[in-house]
């Protein structure tokens, strides 16, 4: 579904830059007449905007979607800045060399004309875009949120929209606060609503469930970390899902040792209060 969301983000930037929606609504409001084309030529200046080519785009979160947005924006002539302190090796290899990978998110707030968020919703990221962050942004910034609804402090956002600090807010999450707020473009969660995305998601879900059942590997879980020990081709493998508390690993290894089982390889990953343990090549 990453490509479907990427296309929505690009569409959102274009719609926020040029008042295409306003122009369409104006045209539909006009009575059919022979001089409609002439009238449109006269009124079109009301809907003028700017091009995104040459503008600075800041991307917070360089996962599957963030990387696709970054690479596509480069091809559209944008100057792209990416921030992700936890970027994966695969994502890093997929990024265009023309993308500036920065170490402080404040640089994005300070310098970028467009800012798009692509991070998971955690306690640490809830309302990550608030009054202080918005205050650091350029006047007239365009903010896009196609990740999670609660990443943005909407009270602070609405105030910034009214004051003109934020030029446009584009989001895929409809709620009563932003749906009728000024200078917002709100879509009804259409990011992955394409035939291709739905097919790809179904195939991906089946493949990842099979990988877990056959190999114990976890990918794209909501409450567990990605944990990949490859295919299970050894004598055996034990996968243990457990609470992320001290001394758990020592208990597992002692239990196996007492049973006369030797562990040749072991992988442990944690996410929040949950962990997964792989022990493989049991002897």
Q: Residue ranges of each PLM-predicted region?
A:
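N-terminal Rossmann-fold NAD(P) dinucleotide-binding loop
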Residues: 66-67
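Aromatic pocket-lining residues of Rossmann-like dinucleotide-binding sites
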Residues: 72-73, 137
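Rossmann-like adenosine-cofactor binding region
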Residues: 85-177, 193
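A conserved regulatory-domain signal marking ACT and ACT-like small-molecule sensing domains
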Residues: 219-281
């Amino acid at each position: 579904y990453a490509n479907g969301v990427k296309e929505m983000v690009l569409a959102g930037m274009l719609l926020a830059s040029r008042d295409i929606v306003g122009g369409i609504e104006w045209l539909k409001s006009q009575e059919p007449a022979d001089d409609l084309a002439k009238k449109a030529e006269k009124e079109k200046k009301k809907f003028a905007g700017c091009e995104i080519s040459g503008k600075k785009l800041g991307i917070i979160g360089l996962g599957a979607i963030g990387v696709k947005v970054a690479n596509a924006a480069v091809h559209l002539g944008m100057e792209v800045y990416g921030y992700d302190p936890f970027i994966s090796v695969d994502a890093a290899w997929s990024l265009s060399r023309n993308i500036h990978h920065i170490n402080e998110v404040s640089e994005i707030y300070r310098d970028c004309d467009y800012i798009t968020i692509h991070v998971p919703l955690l306690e640490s990221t809830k309302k990550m875009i608030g009054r202080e962050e918005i205050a650091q942004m350029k006047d007239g910034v365009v903010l896009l949120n196609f990740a999670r609804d609660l990443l943005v402090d909407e009270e602070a956002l609405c105030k910034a929209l009214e004051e003109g600090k934020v030029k446009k807010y584009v989001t895929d999450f409809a709620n009563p606060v932003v749906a009728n707020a000024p200078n917002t473009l709100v879509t009804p969660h259409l990011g992955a609503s394409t035939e291709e995305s739905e097919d790809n998601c179904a195939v991906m879900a089946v493949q990842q469930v099979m990988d877990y059942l056959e190999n114990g590997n976890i990918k794209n879980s909501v409450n567990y970390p990605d944990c990949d020990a490859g295919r299970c081709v050894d004598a055996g493998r034990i996968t243990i899902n457990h609470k992320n508390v001290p001394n758990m690993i020592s208990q597992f290894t002692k239990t196996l040792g007492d049973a006369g089982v030797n562990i040749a390889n072991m992988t442990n990953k944690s996410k929040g209060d949950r962990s997964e343990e792989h022990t493989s090549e049991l002897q």
